[in-house]
Amino acid sequence: MNNLTLVIPAKFEATTLPLVLKEIRELNLNCKKIVVVPKYDEETLKVLENSDCEILIQKGEGFGNALIEGLNHSTTEYSCIFNADGSFDPKYLNQMLKRNEDNFEFVFSTRYKKPGGSDDDTFLTFIGNYFFTFLCKVLFRLNISDVLYTYVMGKTTAFQ
C-alpha cells in the first residue's frame, strides 16, 4: 500500500484522531498519511507531534479547502479522503485499492449496501441523501448509492 496516501482533514479532532490513527496502525497499512490542520487548532497539532503523519498546515478555510490542499500535496499513485472523526472503517482500504488497481478512476464507499450502515442516520438524513443521490444519478449518470458519503479513493492525478 505504499502507493496510497490518506488525506485526513482534521479540524478540532484532538480526541478522535489518535483513535483513528491507532486503528490504521493496527491494520499494518503501509500508506502515507497527510493530516491537514488549521494553524489555530493547537490541540490537534499537539496530538500529532510524535505521529508518523505528514502534517500540512491549512492555508485556507473549510473542509473542502482542506481536501484540495491535501490532495494537491499527495505524490502517491492513489489518494483516499479519510475522515478524522472515526466515521470511516480503514479495514475497507485494501478492497478499495484493489478496485482502483482494476482500472477504476474512483471508488466510492457507501453506508447503504450490506454490510454497511450508519449509527447516526436519522430518517431526514436518509431521505435527503436518497434525494441527492437520485438527482446525481439522473444529472450526471453516476452509478452510486450514497452521494453524501465522502469515503472516496481514486487516482491522485484524477483528484488533482
Where in the sequence are the language-model features?
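Active-site beta-to-alpha loop of glycosyltransferases that engages the nucleotide-sugar donor
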Residues: 8-21, 39
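Short, structured coil segments at secondary-structure junctions
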Residues: 29, 50-52
